[in-house]
Swiss-Prot record:
It catalyses: di-trans,octa-cis-undecaprenyl diphospho-N-acetyl-alpha-D-muramoyl-L-alanyl-D-glutamyl-meso-2,6-diaminopimeloyl-D-alanyl-D-alanine + UDP-N-acetyl-alpha-D-glucosamine = di-trans,octa-cis-undecaprenyl diphospho-[N-acetyl-alpha-D-glucosaminyl-(1->4)]-N-acetyl-alpha-D-muramoyl-L-alanyl-D-glutamyl-meso-2,6-diaminopimeloyl-D-alanyl-D-alanine + UDP + H(+). It comes from Mycolicibacterium paratuberculosis (strain ATCC BAA-968 / K-10). Pathway: Cell wall biogenesis; peptidoglycan biosynthesis. Its EC number is 2.4.1.227. One of its GO terms (biological process) is lipid glycosylation. This is UDP-N-acetylglucosamine--N-acetylmuramyl-(pentapeptide) pyrophosphoryl-undecaprenol N-acetylglucosamine transferase. One of its GO terms (cellular component) is plasma membrane. It comes from the Bacteria.
């Protein structure tokens, strides 16, 4: 496969860096080459892009190449952020025996061959893996690229509270293993949090609130509920919240609801004097959405929890009821700290939404306490820590090659 998606000129990967940002960088004529393996869903792509931005901030000469597949969100998100993307064969790891499982070995080795070609072409010094469809081939390929370059060091980041198969395999030979939370199932993992883009970690909700509410058409003094279910929406959240529209309006609650590009909402006709119910397929400006909101109802994927807690937004988390319950585990640190609550997907009804939302938005002191608690759980420096670990390892690898005239 090995298709290349080039970054647009003027993208984030080309941004100028602050003076002194690269004091410890390798000389410009020998830039460190970093390959990011984290494609498929936004939960894998966004942490990778946050780390890419942090790499550029630490070393403006670093070469960054992202691995992805033609079916993943990375085909849009990576070029938009200004980075090069190399496409390989997708390797979905089925949770249950299916036809995909029977085809897995041939797909894996095809993807490994393609990834080895990429690592060789970009002269990779280090691979950073985030799990997902491209991570397993990247970890296997890094074990042996060519006779001249038999091994590329690997840094792994596990965002979920329960590590996935790809990262469990990769962690066995990785140079560094980093995680969002303790006890993720990877021995020796160092807790750094989930990498979140700087636009979110530096977001001042209070300072941006007036602009954000004007952007979405809410009054300055509105009580705003934000609802989203990930990049594709969530049917159960859509049904429960839209079904509570009348009760929410009666309680004076405005709603900003991202229902997903493939979904629609069955909303009643608004009555005169009702606060706005703004329904959109997708939110391109999550910074404004977070700033406009007083409360959010959302899933609890690792990236969602990291962003919501980073901005100090009180949350009602509704874990996706699949897998090993990792979404519920992702939310527990914030919930235990007092920054949110968890509602099982099966228990999410219009009546519950109306009751809990009205109770929370009508209690400003409680919301303020939840805001403080949520913000305490966040790790705003996670992206920088992952990037620094990778640069340290990559520089060592490149310097070793320079000292020996080739790869050890």
């Amino acid at each position: 496969m090995n298709d290349t998606v080039k970054k647009p000129t003027g993208g984030r990967g080309d941004d100028p860096l602050p003076a002194g940002a690269a004091l410890s960088a390798v000389a410009p004529h020998e830039p460190v080459s970093v390959v990011l393996a984290g494609g498929g869903t936004a939960g894998h792509v966004e942490p990778a892009m946050a780390v890419a931005d942090a790499l550029k901030a630490l070393d403006p000469h670093v070469r960054i190449t992202a691995l992805g597949t033609a079916r993943g969100l990375e085909t849009r998100l990576v070029p938009e952020r200004g980075y090069d993307l190399e496409l390989i064969t997708p390797v979905p790891l089925p949770r249950k025996p299916t036809g995909d499982l029977a085809r897995l070995p041939s797909r894996v080795w095809r993807a490994v061959r393609e990834t080895r070609a990429v690592l060789h072409a970009v002269d990779a010094d280090v691979v950073i893996g985030f799990g997902g469809y491209v991570a397993l081939p990247a970890y296997l390929a890094a074990r042996g690229v060519s006779p001249r370059k038999p091994r590329v060091p690997v840094v792994i980041h596990e965002a979920n509270a329960s590590a996935g198969l790809a990262n469990r395999v990769g962690a066995r030979t990785a140079q560094r293993v980093l995680s969002a939370v303790p006890d993720c199932g990877l021995p020796g993992a160092e807790v750094v949090g989930v990498p979140v883009r700087e636009a979110i970690t530096s977001l001042d909700r209070a300072a941006l609130r007036a602009e954000a509410r004007r952007h979405f058409g809410f009054a300055d003094d509105a009580r705003v509920l934000l609802v989203f279910g990930g990049s594709q929406g969530a049917a159960s959240l859509n049904r429960a919240v839209s079904g509570a529209a009348a009760q929410l309006a009666a309680a004076g609650v405005s709603v900003l609801h991202a229902h997903g590009p493939k979904n629609t909402l069955d909303l009643r006709e608004p009555q005169p004097g009702d606060p706005p119910y703004v329904a959109v397929p997708y939110l391109d400006r999550m910074d404004l959405a977070y700033a406009a909101a007083d409360l959010v109802i959302c899933r609890s994927g690792a990236m969602t929890v990291a962003e919501v807690s980073a901005v100090g937004l009180p949350a009602i988390y509704v874990p996706l009821p699949i897998g090993n319950g990792e979404q519920r585990l992702n939310a527990l640190p914030v919930v235990d700290a007092g920054g949110g609550m968890v509602v099982a997907d099966a228990d999410l009804t219009p009546e519950l939404v109306a009751r809990e939302v009205a109770g929370l938005v009508g209690d400003p002191p409680r919301l303020a306490a939840m805001t403080t608690a949520a913000a305490r759980v966040g790790h705003p420096d996670a992206a920088r820590r992952v990037a620094q670990a990778a640069l340290d390892i990559g520089r060592t690898a490149r310097l070793a090659r320079g000292a020996t005239g080739g790869r050890p």
